Amino acid sequence: MMKFNSVVWRMLLRDWFLAIRRLGTAQVAVVIALASLALGCKTKSGAAPVSLFPESGEVAGWARSGEVRTFDAKSLWEYIDGDAERYIQAGVSKTLTSDYRYQDKVDGVADIYQMSAPVGAQKIFSTESATDSQPVQVGDEARLYKSSLVFRKGSYFVRLTAYEESSAVSKGLVELARGIESKLGRGGA
């Protein structure tokens, strides 16, 4: 095996710099841009991951506000300090959260907990109080409260919360839940 000493390294660097100088500015910019793209790719296909949250206007009356925030199991306490341990014990692998606004009046939040197995989502759902709730047809099992809705589907547990109570908001929560449910089978992130 050949060892490179400092003289050889200097010669290689000199040759590299001479080659770069022969290229035009535009060509160097293209090389740098292509290298940056190649280094920055995070998915195997190069495609952006599918969002589990409906975009603004996908569900009537709902507009997504802000960026999706992601928490792994280790950092979940930053989002739900005091209750994170319950989700960790149930096998949460990732939590996604996004803010929404309903009919440009009511703020809300959608939380999607991706569990390592469906039994984890079922465990969390079963610990949610059924008091003052009614069952609704969303996912594998769902409960609608005055200003919130929880449901589970496969390995996902979803919590929607609106910061106002009304029958219109309750109906809106069901529609948003169905919008999220339709995306859960797509394997997004």
Residue ranges of predicted features:
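Short, surface-exposed beta-strand/loop micro-motifs that present aromatic residues
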Residues: 95-101, 145-152
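N-terminal secretory signal peptides that target proteins for export/translocation
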Residues: 1-22
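Bacterial N-terminal signal peptides
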Residues: 27-38
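Short, well-ordered beta-strand segments in beta-rich or mixed alpha/beta enzyme
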Residues: 111-114
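Short, surface-exposed coil-to-beta transition loops
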Residues: 106-109, 144-146
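N-terminal "mature-domain start" segment
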Residues: 41-107, 131-135, 157, 163-189
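Solvent-exposed loop/turn segments at secondary-structure junctions
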Residues: 116-120, 143-144, 157, 164-168
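N-terminal low-complexity, intrinsically disordered segments
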Residues: 116-139
